[in-house]
């Protein structure tokens, strides 16, 4: 009888340990987001509300200045992985968010902290300017 309880207790311990490891792995994955994530109307709210610092790049495929800053956004995402989450929102495919935040010029970067707007940056600015505007919120 005691042996059966020991076996059952060990199974429970192993299951709990596995659950804790999964949660830990999930946290590590989130901390190491090192490239811009695709954001849609459906995922926007959850994305901006669930991170301490999020930068959403509002862009369109036909926009030349948007394509010019895309590599800068990629670099910043790598350099600030674990500190800042970068997202890309295609304004042509996600009109609800575009209208809600009155995106009339692109590229526009919106900086959020847990869903609250901290800054709105419009135009294809050089990396040092973008970096300074974003990192002041760290």
Language-model features: locations:
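Hydrophobic heptad-repeat coiled-coil signature
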Residues: 63-66
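Structural microenvironment flanking redox-active thiols in thiol-disulfide oxidoreductases
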Residues: 89-99
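Structural micro-motif
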Residues: 53, 102-110
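Short coil/turn motifs that cap or connect alpha-helices
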Residues: 92, 104-107, 116
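Proteins that catalyze or organize thiol-disulfide redox chemistry
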Residues: 1-55, 61, 71-79, 83, ...
